[in-house]
Structures are given as structure tokens and as C-alpha cells.
Amino acid sequence: MTDYKATLNLPETAFPMKAGLPQREPETLKFWNDIGLYQKLRAIGGDRPKFVLHDGPPYANGSIHIGHAVNKILKDIIVRSKTLAGYDAPYVPGWDCHGLPIEHKVETTHGKNLPADKTRELCREYAAEQIEGQKADFIRLGVLGEWDNPYKTMAFANEANEIRALAEMVRQDFVFKGLKPVNWCFDCGSALAEAEVEYADKTSPTIDVGFPVADADKLAAAFGLAALDKPAQIVIWTTTPWTIPANQALNVHPEIDYALVDAGDRYLVLAEALVEPCLARYQREGKVVATAKGEALELINFRHPFYERLSPVYLADYVALDAGTGIVHSSPAYGEDDFYTCKRYGMSNDDILSPVQSNGVYVDSLPFFGGQFIWKANPNVVAKLEEVGSLLAHETINHSYMHCWRHKTPLIYRATAQWFVGMDKQPGQGASLRERALEAITQTEFIPGWGQARLHGMIAGRPDWCISRQRNWGVPIPFFLHKASGELHPRTVELMEEVAQRVEKEGIEAWFRLDAAELLGDEAAQYDKISDTLDVWFDSGTTHWHVLRGSHRIGHASGPVADLYLEGSDQHRGWFHSSLLTGCAIDNHAPYRQLLTHGFTVDESGRKMSKSLGNTVVPQTVIDTLGADILRLWVASTDYSGEIAVSQQILQRSADAYRRIRNTTRFLLSNLNGFDPAKDLLPPEEMLALDRWAVDRALLLQREIEEAYREYRFWNVYSKVHNFCVQELGGFYLDIIKDRQYTTGANSVARRSCQTALFHIAEALVRWIAPILAFTAEEVWKFLPGERVESVMLATWYDGLGELPADAALNREYWEQVMAVKAAVNKELENQRAAKAVGGNLQAEVTLYAEDALQASLARLGNELRFVLITSTATLAPLASAPADAVDSEVAGLKLKVVKSAHAKCGRCWHHREDVGQHAAHPELCGRCIENIEGSGEVRHYA
């Protein structure tokens, strides 16, 4: 038998079938670095419209986790897709460097008794080390950015510009000093921002405490009685016995009905609606003697249970009937509502009792409990109340309670002198900050849309922003306060600029080393230089000021506005929130146009990642085993708007999908062997109908893919590309063209038409996958024929795809019909193969019994119908002539019959044809193959 292999155009490419991503990806990283890819993109971006994705800075502490990987990959997909869409899309990664976790790490390693300047020095060194480790991991993910010059909140220039941002807010009168209860962590020794508070279950004691009446006559009159004939107590219920020593008032609701209850040895004042459950809790009998509205009790004095002072009744709308007694005990130093109510009744800051120190220990001078830690003092307070006859009930409750997000320990509200950004404080001109921020939210696009209501609710209900902290490692609040008046120096804004200039040269240490006389001269003796530092959320919240308009100047020409902020959904209360407030305070608008939030990673059962559960996925391990492109494909394939499921099984499914895309790409490349687009590319009018359809289908798909990228629907991009590879290419087009590609003349129109289509599709496909499969796309790019720029990222979306003319005889609808018919034939061929009636498809002959219109439609392909169906023979017949053994199909008006061919198999094309053996020189070949190797070659028109 003659070997005709040399007469075939067999596929050939050096593009490897096995990806070997863990080994090959570092080579691509080196290539990007060697050619200066990021710098080249900036160089060509000058005339392009700008798109700015501003990086929310991860904290410079610890290794990256799977959540970091999701976040950075999403950002990179956007930056790359915008670049391919013709934008100048710089990406400057950043790090959040100040704050307690780093300070805590340094103290753990070096001890807590370090001098403050040494602590700052070691914190700076530690943060720098952490940044280098995280940076290497982010680069390994394939994230394209300005890695040689990232922004760091601890960079001197950024520290200086943060001070300038604060100065601008001071100038606009948003900043004030106040005594207010703030979230306080004993372990941090500092106030916490709202974003640093999380809630967890806590078991707490609950106590019902009676406060003896001091104004008995007024209490009797309030209830319409002439006098009281026995002692009376107003009863409060609380879960914080430790606050009783700081009690200064009692709160009732003005509209609630209160009852005077005869409980035997005393009268009890309780909310009427709660009398029954309260008496049951006290294991007492009692009856209601009289009732009165809460407003009647206003300013009646009761006595503190164990201290010689009075607790007056104040009216407060926040009192509710959902638990307790309907009366709330008020410790203004340890409760926000309590604080504001007492202030409303004229209590001065000096009158507010604050016996709890920053470490959670009562001051030594507090009678009965001095020197005790408050949580440990709870039972002692309860015992004292029982001793004095004021304890009516003592139980425990499990409830949701605020905890420090770092230490996981319970917090308290604690009134301290702090610096605040006022939410409702009217600036010199214009709306309040709350009004500005709420208006800015309406001007911002949220993805997904529910984020708008969430952020709106947080801004609408939030208190003033406490921006001061009592720590060493942070950007200073460079204020001088007058020793006598406590007021800011009248030249504060000017002095802050002088400090900023020093910090720009020496870092924050310049402030802490500063002798006040250097700036104030003879005035220095009259002023205190404060040591407070800024909340780290102010650090990251002002990056739009000190990065976009400062250290990197990548904002739009109109100002430091980013097109997009993209972070996890927790950042509605974090970076999105603080950035909105600073942006609206400084520039009167949000620093972003779009906010995109993604969910958190969970395992395939929806459980949170936890080392104890053993369900964590380490990105570095995935990269080392499967490759970064698999991780990127998993991220892209997931709808990030909700929880993002990940596991080894899920990643393996992504690896399987990757292989399908890679194999399809390899098929395209292998069949472009010997193709030079400069001389072999055919114009559309010379291409076969099926090839024109394939290019048109790619064009329509590219439009959908571009739209999906614009709308950040990357899972749609993934599904469209994957389906195109599996169905339209793998399941239809690529199978059909194999015969023509392999058996027709190497330079025939039939083959060059096919290669032209494959070239166009490959040029488009490599760009479609480039934002997601960054490494693989770069690898593919090197194997594509023709002159091209050195990286796919230096290109833009492919513009060589041609559209089918509207009047094309074989239009889109026609090929949809053909695909349906082919699917029906394939189904019957599978049945026949399963029954062992035929072997391969080319051993089959198919007769299609079709109704007239369908028969006429398919007849337009003539003899080439068999090439579309990939059978040795395809015959059309009227539906009415279908024999009894013809099978129905899912195509209306079509029945099928498949039989095994009786003809010999061609040794070259493998078709079973009646003319095999009729040529003496080539007895193993069909006439078509003989024409292709010795004659002028067969002519194809359609497929």
C-alpha cells in the first residue's frame, strides 16, 4: 500500500499541547520585565483616553491569601481589557503601611518597652519586608502594574500629602475636638473606627437594679397619688454591671406608660407593658397601683444604689420595650445615646464621670472597685448591689456584641477627648459632609447595584468620624493646642504645610522629633504639641489625594478622580466609606465614578475559609501545581457579586476548561502551518461560504465579549469563549474543515480560505483570552504567523473580522439551520455506532428525508452537504418517501436513515466512495483525491 501522508497538509505546530504553566509562566514574567511592557504601555498611552482603576491598598502584613488573589486578578482583568479596548489604563499597586497590627508585631518581637522612635523605625522596616513578599506573589499572579514604583502610605511624600489633605479639611472647618464615646479596645489601647468593629456572640450577665427614690413626693404626684406609704425604686435592666459605678441618669420614653407597682415591701416603677415578665423574673407578687406617661417622670431624682449622688430621670426616644424594664440606666461616658441625652440636659464635659482607664481598669480612686479590670469587676458590682438591697434579678444572656477585628476581644464605648470629622458640622460654605456624601452616592454607579443602598444607609446613620488614635506608628495629627484655652493655633493650616514639607524629607519622624519652638518661636511655651496619630482609614481614605494627584499623578486631567474602585463587599464600611468622606470634604465629590464589590471566598459547601476546617486554598500552592492562569480562569468564571466558591475540585474543573481552550487554540495554530497572511490571506469575497460564516460568528461574539468586559461580567466572557471553542468551533466548524484543510491543494483557494478564517479567529481569540489567561495568550501570540508587535498587550481588539453581507445567499439563519440538521445527524450516528452498525462517521451514508422547503435549502450545498455532515454520502429525499425505519429528528420536517457504506475506503481521505479502485496508478484512492494530487484540484464553493 502506498503511503500518501506526504500528499496531505497535516497540522503542525511547536505550540505545546501540555501547558506546563508552573514552569512556563515565570519565563513569560521575565519576558514582560525584559521588554518593559508596563512602561511601553504608558509610552503609547499618551493619545488614548484614560481609565483609572485606583488600587485599594492591602495591609502590609502577612502572606497573601485567596481573597487577595481574587481581588488582584479581577483588577488585572479590568486593566488588561481596558488596555485592549484602546485606553491608557495605568495600574499603580499600593500598600497600607501604618497601624496597630504592624506595631503589635514589632512589640511582640522586640518587646513593648521600646522608645517610640525605635518602634517607628522597626515598624517601617517590617512593613517594607512584608511589601516585598506580597509584591512577589502579586507579580506571580500575572498582575501587570507599576511594581517598581508602587505607592506606600508610609512613603514620605504620601505621609506629607496626607497631612496636607487633613489641613484642607481643617481649612474647611470639618475637623473638631470633642469628648464623645468611641469604640475602644483595651488591647489596642486606642479608639477604633467603625470599620474595625465586628460582632460576635458573648455571654454577659443581666441584672435588674432598683434605684431608690429621692424625690418621693414628686414621684407620688407624677402617679396622681397624695403620698407614698413605703419605699420606692425605679428599676433598670442592663447587660453591663460594670457601668453602674458610672451611672449619672435614668432614661424613660416620654410616650410609654409606666406603672407604680406595689410589690410588698416596696413600690417598683416599671413600664406597664413589662410588669408581668419583670415580676416573674423577680419571683414577686405585685399589683399596679397607678400609671403615668414617661414625660411625667422627667427630672424626678433617684439615688445611686451605693454612691452618694443623685440620678435624675431624662426623656429619651431610644428607650424601647423589646427587653428589660422600659427604663435605661445612663452612663454618659460609656454609651453614645446616654452621652447625647445627658448633653441635651446640660451636662458639661467636666461633669461626665469616666472611671475606666484606657486599659480597662477602674481608676484606683473609685470606691469599692478601684484597680479592678471591668470584666472581672462585674460579679463584684453584682454582689455590692445585692448587699445594698438593690439587686432584683441576676441572669446571663448570650447576645451579639461588638469585638475588635484584630484581637477578637470585647469592646466598650468610652468617652475620650478625640479629634473628629463632623458629619453634620456646617462648613464655612455649602452642605454638611453627610449631605455631600449622600448626594455623591447618587452620582456613583454601583456594581452590583445593591451596594448603593448599603453605603447610603451607612452614611445616613453613621456618627461623626473619630480620626485620632493614641499610637506610635501612624501619620501624626500635627496640631498645637493652646495650654489655657485648648484651642488650635490660629495658623494651624499654615503650620501643617510647614510640617508636611519636613515630613516629605524625613518622614513622620520629623514631627515627633520636632521642637515646637522651631515653628512657633516664642509662642511655643503657650502651646502643647499633641502626639495623636491618624486613623489608618484616613491613610487609605486619602490616597485619591496623595496618589492620584500626588506621588503618581494618574488621575484624570479634571482632577484626582478614579473611574473605578474595586474591593470586597466589607469595604462599604471601610475604604469606599472613608474615601467618600475625604473626597466629599476636600473636593465636594466622590473620588470614584464606579464602585465594584466582590464577595468573599467560601468552600464548595458555602462555608467560610478556616484553617480549623481544613478548607483553605493557598494561592501559592495552586500556582505551583496548576499555574496562575488556572487561578485566573477560576476567578473569571465565577460571578463575584456573591460568595465565591473555591476548592481543589472547583479548580480542577477550571483546569479542564482551560485544556479545552488551549487545545482549540493549538488546533488553530497547527492548521496555520505554512500560512503567511501577507500573501496567503484571501479577501472575504473569495472565501467559501462556511468560512465567511465562521468569521462573521467570531465578529458577533467579539461584540458580545467586548460588552461583557465593559460591564465587568467576566463569567460571561469565560462562558462565551468556552462555548465557542466547544460548540461552534469544536462541535461544528473545525470538524467540517479538517477534510478540506488536509486533503485539498496546499495553496488551493479551498485551503487558503479555511486558513484565512482560522487566522482571523485566532487573532481575535488570543485577544479575547488575554485579560484572563494572560500567560497563555502571550504564549499563543508568539506562535501566530505574520508581523506583529512583541506582546499581545501592545495590541487592541482585533479589527480584521468581516461581517456577512445582509444579502448573503447563505446567511446566518441558513447556517443555524444547517447546524441543527448536523446535530440531528450526529445524534443518529452516535446511536448507530453504539449499536455497532457503523464504525466511524465516514463509514456511514445518510439519507435526509425532508419537507420541501428544508430539502431545497439543504440542496443549495450540493455535493458538499456530505462534507458538512462528515459522512461519505449525503442524499436528500422528500419527507413523504421516508421508509418505516427512518428515524424522527428534533428538526421539524426531517427524518433520517443511516446505513453502512458498501463502498471501499479511500486510503487518503478515508471516505467510502464508489470510484475507489478505478484508477490503475492509484487503486487505493477515490477520484477526488487523485484530482487533488495529480490534477488541478477539486473546487469547493460552500464547505
From Swiss-Prot:
<comment type="similarity">
    <text>Belongs to the class-I aminoacyl-tRNA synthetase family. IleS type 1 subfamily.</text>
</comment>
<dbReference type="InterPro" id="IPR009008">
    <property type="entry name" value="Val/Leu/Ile-tRNA-synth_edit"/>
</dbReference>
<feature type="binding site">
    <location>
        <position position="909"/>
    </location>
    <ligand>
        <name>Zn(2+)</name>
    </ligand>
</feature>
<keyword id="KW-0479">Metal-binding</keyword>
<dbReference type="InterPro" id="IPR010663">
    <property type="entry name" value="Znf_FPG/IleRS"/>
</dbReference>
<dbReference type="GO" id="GO:0000049">
    <property type="term" value="F:tRNA binding"/>
</dbReference>
<keyword id="KW-0862">Zinc</keyword>
<dbReference type="InterPro" id="IPR014729">
    <property type="entry name" value="Rossmann-like_a/b/a_fold"/>
</dbReference>
<feature type="binding site">
    <location>
        <position position="611"/>
    </location>
    <ligand>
        <name>ATP</name>
    </ligand>
</feature>
<dbReference type="GO" id="GO:0006428">
    <property type="term" value="P:isoleucyl-tRNA aminoacylation"/>
</dbReference>
<dbReference type="InterPro" id="IPR013155">
    <property type="entry name" value="M/V/L/I-tRNA-synth_anticd-bd"/>
</dbReference>
<feature type="binding site">
    <location>
        <position position="567"/>
    </location>
    <ligand>
        <name>L-isoleucyl-5'-AMP</name>
    </ligand>
</feature>
<dbReference type="GO" id="GO:0004822">
    <property type="term" value="F:isoleucine-tRNA ligase activity"/>
</dbReference>
<dbReference type="Pfam" id="PF00133">
    <property type="entry name" value="tRNA-synt_1"/>
</dbReference>
<keyword id="KW-0030">Aminoacyl-tRNA synthetase</keyword>
<dbReference type="InterPro" id="IPR023585">
    <property type="entry name" value="Ile-tRNA-ligase_type1"/>
</dbReference>
<dbReference type="InterPro" id="IPR001412">
    <property type="entry name" value="aa-tRNA-synth_I_CS"/>
</dbReference>
<keyword id="KW-0067">ATP-binding</keyword>
<feature type="binding site">
    <location>
        <position position="929"/>
    </location>
    <ligand>
        <name>Zn(2+)</name>
    </ligand>
</feature>
<dbReference type="InterPro" id="IPR002301">
    <property type="entry name" value="Ile-tRNA-ligase"/>
</dbReference>
<dbReference type="Pfam" id="PF06827">
    <property type="entry name" value="zf-FPG_IleRS"/>
</dbReference>
<comment type="function">
    <text>Catalyzes the attachment of isoleucine to tRNA(Ile). As IleRS can inadvertently accommodate and process structurally similar amino acids such as valine, to avoid such errors it has two additional distinct tRNA(Ile)-dependent editing activities. One activity is designated as 'pretransfer' editing and involves the hydrolysis of activated Val-AMP. The other activity is designated 'posttransfer' editing and involves deacylation of mischarged Val-tRNA(Ile).</text>
</comment>
<feature type="short sequence motif" description="'HIGH' region">
    <location>
        <begin position="58"/>
        <end position="68"/>
    </location>
</feature>
<keyword id="KW-0547">Nucleotide-binding</keyword>
<dbReference type="Pfam" id="PF08264">
    <property type="entry name" value="Anticodon_1"/>
</dbReference>
<protein>
    <recommendedName>
        <fullName>Isoleucine--tRNA ligase</fullName>
        <ecNumber>6.1.1.5</ecNumber>
    </recommendedName>
</protein>
<keyword id="KW-0963">Cytoplasm</keyword>
<keyword id="KW-0436">Ligase</keyword>
<feature type="binding site">
    <location>
        <position position="926"/>
    </location>
    <ligand>
        <name>Zn(2+)</name>
    </ligand>
</feature>
<feature type="binding site">
    <location>
        <position position="906"/>
    </location>
    <ligand>
        <name>Zn(2+)</name>
    </ligand>
</feature>
<keyword id="KW-0648">Protein biosynthesis</keyword>
<dbReference type="GO" id="GO:0005829">
    <property type="term" value="C:cytosol"/>
</dbReference>
<dbReference type="GO" id="GO:0002161">
    <property type="term" value="F:aminoacyl-tRNA deacylase activity"/>
</dbReference>
<dbReference type="GO" id="GO:0008270">
    <property type="term" value="F:zinc ion binding"/>
</dbReference>
<dbReference type="GO" id="GO:0005524">
    <property type="term" value="F:ATP binding"/>
</dbReference>
<dbReference type="InterPro" id="IPR009080">
    <property type="entry name" value="tRNAsynth_Ia_anticodon-bd"/>
</dbReference>
<dbReference type="InterPro" id="IPR002300">
    <property type="entry name" value="aa-tRNA-synth_Ia"/>
</dbReference>
<comment type="subunit">
    <text>Monomer.</text>
</comment>
<dbReference type="InterPro" id="IPR050081">
    <property type="entry name" value="Ile-tRNA_ligase"/>
</dbReference>
<dbReference type="InterPro" id="IPR033708">
    <property type="entry name" value="Anticodon_Ile_BEm"/>
</dbReference>
<feature type="short sequence motif" description="'KMSKS' region">
    <location>
        <begin position="608"/>
        <end position="612"/>
    </location>
</feature>
